[in-house]
A protein has these predicted regions:
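Low-complexity intrinsically disordered segments
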Residues: 56-133
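N-terminal interaction modules that seed assembly of large macromolecular complexes
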Residues: 2-4, 8-65, 69
Length: 133
C-alpha cells in the first residue's frame, strides 16, 4: 500500500493503541490501573501484528533519514543548532510527505468488534486506510 511517511507513522500509533484500554480497578481503598485487552479474533490480532511489524520497519527507515538530516544540517553533530531549526523542520516536512510502499494486511471493519471495543475515534480515523467496510 502506498502511503506517506506521515500517514504510516500515524497508522503505527493507532495500531499500537489496539493493545487494550486502561481501566481503574478499586480493591477496598486501593486503586489500580490495569490494561483490559480489546477483543479481536485470532485472524484480526495476527493482521494487526503483521501491520505493526511492517510499519515499525517503515518508522525505522524514517528515523534513519531523520538522523541523517540532523547530522547533515548540523555538520556532523547530534543536535540541530537553533539557527538551523527552520531548515530541519522544512526537510522533515518534505520527508513526511514522501510516499513509501508498505505491505499491509487489510482489516474488516466488523472484525474490529466496535460494539464491544471502545476504540477512540482518533484511533479509528488513523486506521481508516487499513480498514475495509
Amino acid at each position: 500500500m502506498k502511503m506517506t511517511y506521515a500517514s504510516a507513522l500515524e497508522a503505527l500509533s493507532a495500531l499500537e493503541a489496539l493493545d487494550g484500554e486502561n481501566t481503574i480497578i478499586r480493591d477496598g481503598g486501593r486503586e489500580q490501573v490495569i490494561r483490559k485487552p480489546y477483543q479481536f479474533s485470532a485472524a484480526t490480532r495476527m493482521a494487526i501484528a503483521r501491520n505493526l511489524c511492517a510499519l515499525q520497519a517503515t518508522r525505522d527507515v524514517f528515523t534513519l533519514a531523520r538522523n541523517d538530516a540532523i547530522r547533515r544540517i548540523s555538520g556532523g553533530k547530534s543536535t540541530v543548532p537553533d539557527d538551523l531549526r527552520d531548515d530541519f523542520a522544512s526537510e522533515m516536512a518534505d520527508l513526511a510527505r514522501q510516499e513509501t510502499d508498505v505491505a499491509l494486511a487489510r482489516v474488516i471493519e466488523a472484525d474490529l468488534n466496535l460494539a464491544e471495543n471502545r476504540l477512540p475515534p482518533t484511533v479509528l480515523a488513523a486506521l481508516l486506510p487499513l480498514v475495509d467496510a
